[in-house]
Amino acid sequence: MMSQIQRAISTMSQPYKHRFVVKVGEHIRPIPVAEVLYFTSQEKVTFMQTHADQARRFIIDYSLDQVEAAVDPNRFFRISRQYIVSLEAVKDIVAYSSSRLKLTLKHCEDNQVLVSRERVGSFRQWLDQ
């Protein structure tokens, strides 16, 4: 209980990232967090999907654990070991089994984006805030 309170206090005083810097060819571009739909990790590489004019996917130099600590938890939720999503990214939610949810995300080729069993309750609370 005490560690949860301490974590909540440190979270309240922590400034969250406003942008991520990505490399595009030889160019470096700042991407505002407001343009990010979700983050995903595949084979130890972390990607950031945007929804701007030309929806693009960028490689970022952060692990999902680092991203989770750097972004506002009111805006993003870690649904599994592979995904951190924003509410804007979610097109559809389907009850996948008695204890899991399947999400359809905008600009996502993966049609099996599942909320882990351990996070379903917290995810539902996050949706309802």
Segments (PLM) and residue ranges:
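C-terminal output/interaction extensions
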Residues: S122-Q129
